[in-house]
Amino acid sequence: MSDFTHFNEQGRAKMVDVGEKPISQRTAVAAGRVLVNEKTFALIQSGGMKKGDVLTVAQIAGVMGAKRTPDIIPMCHPILMDGINLDLSLDETRKSVEIRATVTCDGRTGVEMEALSAVSIAALTVYDMCKAVQKDMTITDIRLVSKTGGVHGDYFREEN
């Protein structure tokens, strides 16, 4: 078990000590989508959803989700984030809400989980705001697109 940094001597989960790691500039980008039907798409597009402006509320929820990541994922460190940006757009061809989150910080650990949380919470918010109209929406393709900084180097996902 000693090769795994997330386990203590008894084999139980622990939060990794990052105190000795150097501070570096870090960025993570995550993305995902919510597939909807034509009626739901039209209501989102026109601003006609009874709960309000779906894209704006989901954007705010995504920012809040990134900030709350260590509260819902046990081994995530609380991180002082420098920036959280969510872009939500409508894809007419797919009939989807496209979600992209970028999170930045100067820190000892990365912000991948914060970016993924932002996308996930934004997607769940889209679902919540539209569920009265459509129950069979699909939240899909949540993924890490890229990350920079840290001792493990940069990562860029091959995207189509």
Which residues does each predicted region cover?
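C-terminal binding/interaction regions
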Residues: 1-55, 60-77, 83-160
